[in-house]
Amino acid sequence: MNLNDIATQLLFTTVPIRGNMPNGSVKTGTGFFFSVKDEGNPNQIIPLLITNYHVLENITSGFIEFNIQQNGEPVKDKSVKVSFDSNIIDNNKLGNLDLVAIPIAGVINDLLQKNIQVFYKSILPEYIPSAQEIENLSAIEDLTFIGYPNGLYDQTNHNPIVRKGITATPIWNNFKGKPDFLIDGGVYPGSSGSPVFIYNQGSYPTAEGISIGTRLHFVGVIYETSISTANNQTTFLNLGIAINSIVIYDELKLYVKKLLDN
């Protein structure tokens, strides 16, 4: 396993979430790691787990499954499940967005006390494209999104499912007046909370032509699957809706400030 490879690192930015509902049904979703710095103390890193609010809403209990590390590398056949209850979403909602941010430093430290080291890679603020970079994107961009569609993942190696798609609406437009964009790709229930990337290897289009090299942008988070219902039959349209990462980061900065003030 080449952990210096960007694509390999992206495999470890997500975790599966499984929750129990009061009626006995089960919800599945995707969470991802995002780390921010304390602006007052740049040496302090605040690791967060982010997912959709609706993934955790009304859940009575559940678990998040982390990869375990040994000698700085993930152990393929080992993981640890961390339980949670309905309090997990308390005071953690990101404004009016369908997102929650959960501080995980305490969880990681508790596991360390039990000699359990988890392995993960955080998405960083510098992966978010600037407003100018978004304006310079093509209307049709290749997208990569990572998660657990229908709760599916490689439970032996503890890896998520990586899927590809394209922008069905330009990222620089607000889809239906909201800070969203539409994805044409295999977006199914369980994909909620999946981070969406523009990840190009070798070359990619720019406003000036074709650039040589690698490009990585964290552009959004999936929160809805588009379906059509007719004659009591549900048809997935292979479309998903994602929240723009710039808006997410704006809310995250407010959330972290509130977190530190408390």
What do these predicted ranges mean?
Residues 7-10, 198-262:
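C-terminal subregion of chymotrypsin/trypsin-like serine protease catalytic domains
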Residues 40-42:
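Short loop segments and helix-boundary regions at transmembrane helix junctions
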Residues 55-56, 226:
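Hydrophobic pocket-lining residues within nucleotide cofactor-binding pockets
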Residues 1-4:
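N-terminal targeting leaders that route proteins to membranes or the secretory/organellar pathways
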Residues 11-15, 19, 27-28, 32, ...:
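Serine endopeptidase catalytic core focused on the charge-relay Asp
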Residues 51:
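Cytochrome P450 catalytic-core helices
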